[in-house]
Amino acid sequence: CDIPQSTNCGGNVYSNDDINTAIQGALDDVANGDRPDNYPHQYYDEASEDITLCCGSGPWSEFPLVYNGPYYSSRDNYVSPGPDRVIYQTNTGEFCATVTHTGAASYDGFTQCS
């Protein structure tokens, strides 16, 4: 499905460019084998979270959604990933959803961004 023009994740509003930059950053990290920050990593679709993925079947990956991205952190320069993520189809980079830990039912759970 198409990347939305914007998304609201618990009050953080991201543009289409922010979302696209996050997906591209994730794909670049994988291609370069550069993952000291442990992102991207696999996303597990938990039925209890009621997240709608608008892309094809998995595997899916998640990557931090930040302003002025893409997100990058290293052992020597740790940067918090924040609460917001973009979910994409691991093999194709197709956009699936934006999700946030803000307001989720559990500490490590997600809720869908609007």
From Swiss-Prot:
Keyword Lyase tagged: yes
Disulfide feature: C1-C54, C9-C113, C55-C96
Residues holding Ca(2+) 1: D29, V30, N32, D37
Coiled-coil region(s): none
Domain of life: Eukaryota
Any Pfam family the entry gives: Ribonuclease
One annotated GO molecular function: RNA binding
Catalytic activity of the protein: [RNA] containing adenosine + H2O = an [RNA fragment]-3'-adenosine-3'-phosphate + a 5'-hydroxy-ribonucleotide-3'-[RNA fragment]; [RNA] containing guanosine + H2O = an [RNA fragment]-3'-guanosine-3'-phosphate + a 5'-hydroxy-ribonucleotide-3'-[RNA fragment]
Extra remark beyond the main annotation: After treatment by base Asn-32 and Asp-45 partially isomerize by succinimide rearrangement to form isoaspartyl peptides.
Protein name: Ribonuclease U2
Provenance organism: Ustilago sphaerogena (Smut fungus)
